[in-house]
C-alpha cells in the first residue's frame, strides 16, 4: 500500500512517498516546494513517482485555495486524498483542546507522531512538542497521551518584521545570537531567539511540575535548527515528526 504523505504549512509543502503505512519506515522519495510553485508538482517531481501512490494522507494549515491547488496536482493518479481533521482522540492521543476540531491539524499530527515515537522507544513519559516555523507552537502531552494544551507565538521572522514595522530605525541586517549583544542586529536576533527558547523552557517546567517527571522535548519544523542552540534543556531535533504522525494515523485507519 504505497502512501503519499503531504504536509502543507504556511510557507512550504513537504511530501514523502512510503512503500507502506508502517510507522518508522523510510520514504522511497521525498521533496519540498514553496507554496508559490506547487502548481508544477504534477509535471515535475510527482510525474515520475514509482510506484505510484495508492493512498494519499495529508495535513494542511494553509488556505482552502492552496489545498485545492494541491488536489489538482493529485489528479495525476486515480486516488482521493484524505486530509487530517483533529478529533476527540486518535492513535493513542486524547485531545484536550476546548474545541478539538479547532486545533491545528499540524499540531495534532505532530502530537500523534511524538506519542508514537515515545511508545516505540518503550517509554511512557510526558512530551513537549515544539514546532518552529512561520509561527512557533509548544504543546504538552502527558504520559498517558493526553494533550494538556499549548502555546502559539510568532516565529523569529514575524517578530523582526513586527519590530521593523512598528519602530523607527530598526531595519538592520540579520545579526548573530550573543549572550550580551552589543549592536542592534545582534540584539534583535538574540532577543527573538531567547524569547522563543524562554517560552519553550517555561512550558517544560510547567509540564514537569504537572506530571512529576522531566518531559522529553522534541523540536521539529523548518526553523527548528535556529531554536535548539539556545535551549538549556535536553531535546531532540526531529525533522520528520509530521510524517511520523501521518504514518501512524494511516496505519491505525488501515
UniProtKB/Swiss-Prot annotation:
The active site is at 106 (proton acceptor). Gene3D superfamilies: 3.30.420.40. Disulfide bonds: none annotated. Its EC number is 2.7.1.33. Substrate binds at residues 97, 104-107, 184. This is Type III pantothenate kinase. Homodimer. It is found in: Cytoplasm. It catalyses: (R)-pantothenate + ATP = (R)-4'-phosphopantothenate + ADP + H(+). ATP binds at residues 7-14, 134. GO terms for cellular component: cytoplasm. It holds the Pfam family Pan_kinase. It comes from the Bacteria. A monovalent cation. Ammonium or potassium. The keyword Kinase applies. CDD domains: ASKHA_NBD_PanK-III. Its cofactor is NH4(+); K(+). Catalyzes the phosphorylation of pantothenate (Pan), the first step in CoA biosynthesis. The gene is coaX. It comes from Methylibium petroleiphilum (strain ATCC BAA-1232 / LMG 22953 / PM1). One of its GO terms (molecular function) is ATP binding. GO terms for biological process: coenzyme A biosynthetic process. Belongs to the type III pantothenate kinase family. Pathway: Cofactor biosynthesis; coenzyme A biosynthesis; CoA from (R)-pantothenate: step 1/5. The keyword Kinase applies. Keywords: ATP-binding, Coenzyme A biosynthesis, Cytoplasm, Kinase, Nucleotide-binding, Potassium, Transferase.
